């Protein structure tokens, strides 16, 4: 299993659950977690996924031969939290590149370089389907990811290709959201309330649900919520 964005949050939880279930896991990103560097079935490839040149040079090919290979495009950033016109070119470019472009480029490599049975997943978001004030770049990037998954699923009906909505998860990104101002993000009070009431989903719950979906053989929607597949 290849997972991007494994240093914390959902990606780290997916890696831990996959290792527990016996998968070989290769993480891709800037910071290697000890979980992968110290585990016999773990490995890590250093690559800044917001760097187009580094991403273009990256190869997913491996000498190992697997019965099945799964790519989970999980790396992402909240991006600029402010009215759209106040976001800088650099902020917008970084958000779109990391959240959408890198996932598309990695998926293209995955589909062409990896042989055998394949499954492809993207960490999506409810923000792909609802306009949230202050999150213009994030909403747009996640909408792009959802549509890309839908198109690839049509182009490759023989493969399992999905984007999953994890819901509001207790991750560093949520802490970043709570640290914003009401001026930049009018909905911040709701996210603070969700955290203080203990309503956030644990990353481990999302990971368990996703691995359950990966192991299923029946058809499921291309875009799905992990909360519908809890174990």
Where are these regions (language model features)?
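Conserved mid-core segment of classical short-chain dehydrogenase/reductases
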Residues: 78-93, 134
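Residue(s) in the substrate-gating loop at a strand-loop-helix junction
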Residues: 125
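Conserved glycine-rich Rossmann-like NAD(P)H-binding loop of the short-chain dehydrogenase/reductase
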Residues: 21-35
């Amino acid at each position: 299993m290849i997972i991007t964005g494994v240093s914390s949050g959902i990606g780290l939880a997916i890696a831990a659950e996959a290792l527990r279930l016996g998968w070989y896991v290769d993480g891709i990103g800037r910071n290697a977690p000890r979980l992968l560097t110290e585990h016999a079935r773990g490995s890590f490839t250093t690559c800044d996924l917001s760097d187009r040149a580094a991403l273009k040079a990256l190869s997913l090919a491996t000498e190992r031969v697997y019965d099945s290979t799964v790519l989970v495009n999980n790396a992402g950033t909240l991006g600029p939290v402010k009215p759209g016109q106040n976001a800088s070119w650099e902020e917008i470019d970084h958000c779109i590149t990391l959240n959408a472009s890198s996932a598309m480029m990695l998926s293209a490599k995955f589909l062409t370089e990896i042989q055998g049975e394949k499954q492809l997943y993207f960490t999506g978001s409810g923000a792909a389907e609802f306009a949230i004030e202050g999150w213009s770049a994030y909403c747009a990037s996640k909408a792009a990811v959802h549509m890309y998954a839908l198109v690839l699923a049509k182009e490759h009906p023989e493969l399992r290709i999905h984007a999953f909505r994890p819901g509001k998860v207790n991750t560093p990104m949520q802490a970043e959201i709570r640290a914003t101002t009401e001026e930049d993000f009018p909905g911040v009070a709701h996210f603070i309330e969700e955290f203080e009431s203990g309503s956030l989903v644990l990353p481990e719950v999302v990971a368990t649900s996703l691995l359950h979906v990966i192991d299923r053989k029946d058809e499921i929607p291309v875009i799905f919520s992990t909360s519908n597949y809890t174990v």
